[in-house]
Structures are given as structure tokens and as C-alpha cells.
Amino acid sequence: MTFRHCVAVDLGASSGRVMLARYDSKHRTLTLREIHRFVNCLQKTDGFDTWDIDSLEKDIRLGLKKVCNEGILIDSIGIDTWGVDYVLLDKQGQRVGLPVSYRDNRTTGIMPQALVQIGKSEIYRRSGIQFLPFNTIYQLRALTKQQPELTAQVAHALLMPDYFSYRLTGEMNWEYTNATTTQLVNINTDDWDDTLLAWTGAKKSWFGRPSHPGNVIGDWICPQGNRIPVVAVASHDTASAVIASPLANKHSAYLSSGTWSLMGFESKKPYTTDEALAANITNEGGAEGRYRVLKNIMGLWLLQRVLKERRITDLPVLIAQTEALPACRFLINPNDDRFINPDDMRAEIQAACRETDQPVPVSDAELARCIFDSLALLYADILHELANLRGEKFTQLHIVGGGCQNALLNQLCANACGIRVMAGPVEASTLGNIGIQLMTLDELNNVDDFRQVVSANYDLTTYIPNPDSEIARHVAQFQPKRQTKELCA
């Protein structure tokens, strides 16, 4: 067969898309077409920040039906989403309550309990995963302690992409790359860790053994009656994005830039040393047994909230205004946990500047400048941390995802990090999702083979660092931990 048609369902924390890929195996050309885009946002339910899971499923099905109604024969479907959140099911496979978002405050104070009762080094030794207060391990503990009546109804817990695959196929699956984000998977066995799971109060019977990307979960029956395989892709969206990052060699780092920024490198081994623990480095699962050694950064969430609060719709105009302002007048630590979900992001940023005796950003452009400069400096700090961890400097940084369209931030990143930046592709998560599907269909050999396809089909933009830039001069002065409460604290 010359042509393959694969559908990627790519769900982010603010929007979702159903994308159709067309792959020409003879010429190795790959094109994407957006079929359906929809909003994903939090809602308040019984005092919790929850996801409208039924609306998301409705939009997924609508997108799939749109493809089928075009008369296109779909070869496979794959689903990727954000990590850590989950859906609870009862014995009949029916949903128990609505899934609570990781941005809900129910986990406040939970992580410190684990550090005392299990021990920080012991948790890290078992999981290799960074300490974030909203990790699934702490969400489950909050669930079982705060909602025992709801907990008593639970027979299964599925992570978000696995839930949607289940709804399409009727088959349950626990995909490995996303499972590792829970901080509940043992890094040595690739299975759920009994000690960590027991601490949450959840039952091990709620979960099946994690499966690696590339297996067929089951079939979705389209309106025309065709059975279409649903593939377990690298279902954590960052895992998919990394697959599509055209990393040149072992000296290339990546930055998946979106609501969250995730900076790291690929490795065949995990890093679980005391130094890695001190730096709060995570070792998330990747395709083909690779590890994604990385750190989470709050990312463009801060800007997204400011845009929403200020009702700004013309981002290019705002960026142009921002670029005209002097650099580094207002600096914050984007990873301060005060920015996870404040009532007023603008006021929170202003308060952080005021508390550190800096000028206070007032205009929208000043707020954006504060965010961009602070992110770029934090990127530089973390890239240096990662280089020290592995004992080798990086020579190139690949920025992928929606944030790679921000030319100003890309250049600031290059200047601060002092290395060449390659930006693109934008649709990295979708492409990585498609890549695993094509491998499962025996159209491609492996991840490296797929990256060659990506490089041949998608143009990258190069940013050369300017060592004389204002932000480059601020790198040594930047103290990202000067605010009081880091995400991992």
C-alpha cells in the first residue's frame, strides 16, 4: 500500500485536535490536516476543578466521524494527552465522578506527608520521577483520604488517554510513557511500585501492568462499520513530542514548549543519583526503552492566563510591543508554585516582583516581557543543570510544540543558553503520535527512521545566540530559586 491514513487525537490542557496524517511510503512524504479543533477548560464541580470528560469524548468522536464521512479509510488511531490526571471507573466500567484536574488545590500539603512517611530519597530511588505536588501519587492519596465514599466505588483507574481509548474500544490499557508520570511506576521493573501505591490508599487491582508504545489496544467501529485499530502510542504528549524532535546527536537537548515547558535530553539510562535528586530531575519513560531525562517548567501557562484575564486576542501585536521594551527589568521564577493556578495571574506576577524589590510590570507588554525574560533565563539555568548532570555540554537545543512559533522567546532562549536553537516542528505531539502508528503499521523501522521523515518534511528555523545581548549578561545574576516555594518544595 502506497498511502496510509492515520488519525491523531492530541489533547492538551487548553485545547484538543483531531488531526489526519497522510503518509506516502514510496516517497516518504508526510502531511497533516486539522479535522476538528475544540476547547478544553476547567470547570467547578462540587468545589473541585474538574475536566468536562464527556464533552471531550463527544468532540473526539465528532472528529473521527468527520474523517470517515470524507470517505477516507483510516488505517489506525492514536491518542495522546497531558499527564498525571486519571478517570475512575466502577465494576461495570462506568465512570465514578468527574476527573479532577492536577491544578486543583486538593493536593496541598500531601507531598510533604510522603516525604516524611516514605522518605524523599526512597521515593526517588523507586520511581526516578521529579517531585511535583500534583503528581498522581499525591492526587490518589488526596482522593482516598478526602473522599472515602467515592473511593469505595472504584474498581479501575485509567489515565486520560487510556480512558478515551477504552471508550472507543471497550479495552483497558495502561500505557507506559504516561504511567511513568504518576511517580508510581518502579523504574527497575516498569510495573507499579507496591510500596508507593500502598501509601496512596489505592488498590493495585485498579491498574494493569503498563504496556509499551506500539501495541494495538482494540478496534473502533466507525459509522460505516469498518473496524479501525486504536494504537497505544507514546500517550504522554511530551513523549510523543520528543519522538518527533529531529535531534541531531547526543549533544542535542530538547524543549517541548507549550502550556508547560519540558526541557531535557534522551538517554538509554536513567539518572537517579543524589545530584539528580537534588536538582529534581525526572526520568520519564520514552519509546524504545529510552528515558526522557528532563525538568518541568511552568511555561506559557503564565502568558495564557494573562491573555485570558486581559482579553488579549492579537498575540503578534503584543509580542512586537514586548520586543521593543528593555530586557530583564522584571524577573520572576516561573516555577514558583504561586503561579500554578492563582486567582489573578497579573496580580501574582506583580506581587512577586514587588516582594523582591524590583520594578512592577504594569502594561500588558511589560507583563509579557517579564514572562519571556524569566522563562529564557530559567531555560538557561536548567540546561546548565542538565549538562552538569550528564557531564557533557549541549551544542544545540530543539524547541518543538506551539511555543516554537514565538520568535522572540526563541531568540531570547538562544541568547540566554548560549547555543544554537532549532525551532520546529510546531505539531510535534501530533507527529510523534503518528510516528508510533506508522511503526506499528510496519511503515517505519524505528524512532530514528521517523525523525528522518520529520526532518525531510518540516522546515526548521535557526536562531544563533548573541553573546552581547542584555539577557546573556543577566544569566550569571539570575537566581531562579529566590522566590519562596518551588514546584518541588
From Swiss-Prot:
GO CC annotation: cytosol
Protein name according to UniProt: Rhamnulokinase
Family named by the database record: Belongs to the rhamnulokinase family.
Residues annotated as the enzyme's active site: D237
Matches recorded under InterPro entries: ATPase_NBD, FGGY_C, FGGY_N, Rhamnulokinase
Enzyme superclass (EC): transferase
One biological process term in Gene Ontology: rhamnose catabolic process
Biochemical pathway: Carbohydrate degradation; L-rhamnose degradation; glycerone phosphate from L-rhamnose: step 2/3
Protein transport among keywords: no
